[in-house]
Amino acid sequence: MAIGLVGRKCGMTHIFTDAGAAVPVTVIHVEPNRVVQVKTLESDGYRAIQVTTGSKKRSRLTKADAGHYSKAGVEAGRGLWEFRLEDSDQDYTVGTELGVGVFAEGQFVDARARSIGKGFAGVVKRHNFRTQDATHGNSLSHRAPGSIGQNQTPGRVFKGKRMAGHMGDKNITVPNLRIVGIDAERSLLLVKGAVPGTKGADVIVRPAAKK
């Protein structure tokens, strides 16, 4: 099964194993994921489902989104996400609700979310450069990156050069996190380790691609 779920990060806590060891976990609240659209090989060239979760006032929707939800007959959510289907996956119908039962305890998953933005950061913070001398003639270049290139040849700065810039606030996938607990009553996933994003951030949880 390749489909995943969209949940919200609640924060981190820890649980204890039978041996008494503390395990750090991220708690993800998964509201029902409602299928808004089913894509097929015949009409779209590939198989996938489009889901939404949560709720959103109709007055906050664009006309295009309002029409899309109305056509499907599904309550508007806070966003739209798509999951590709494999040939072995079952067929889904519009309006189907998916929950934490999609996953099993002990299963490995990939978690994708938008990382916390850190603003404009220098190379020491952003790329872990070491600082230059604090003294011995160094007056202005304590946290400077140093040389960023050569001379007239090649006469440019190469792409990918690590420099100061905006840090964080980008989509990050953390692979191979193990589900150590599922609370079906409260629709919670307990995932071992840290997941990107702030509290309340949308997290896409998929079966691990490399397990």
Curated annotation (Swiss-Prot):
GO terms for biological process: translation. InterPro entries: Ribosomal_uL3 (IPR000597), Ribosomal_uL3_bac/org-type (IPR019927), Ribosomal_uL3_CS (IPR019926), Transl_B-barrel_sf (IPR009000). Disulfide bonds: none annotated. Transmembrane segments: none annotated. Residues 134-155 are annotated as: Disordered. Keywords: Methylation, Ribonucleoprotein, Ribosomal protein, RNA-binding, rRNA-binding. The keyword RNA-binding applies. SUPFAM superfamilies: Translation proteins (SSF50447). One of its GO terms (cellular component) is cytosolic large ribosomal subunit. Gene3D superfamilies: 3.30.160.810, Translation factors. Methylated by PrmB. GO terms for molecular function: rRNA binding; structural constituent of ribosome. It comes from the Bacteria. Signal peptide: none annotated. The modification N5-methylglutamine is found at Q152. PROSITE patterns: RIBOSOMAL_L3. One of the primary rRNA binding proteins, it binds directly near the 3'-end of the 23S rRNA, where it nucleates assembly of the 50S subunit. HAMAP family: Ribosomal_uL3_B. Part of the 50S ribosomal subunit. Forms a cluster with proteins L14 and L19. Belongs to the universal ribosomal protein uL3 family. This is Large ribosomal subunit protein uL3. It comes from Methylococcus capsulatus (strain ATCC 33009 / NCIMB 11132 / Bath).
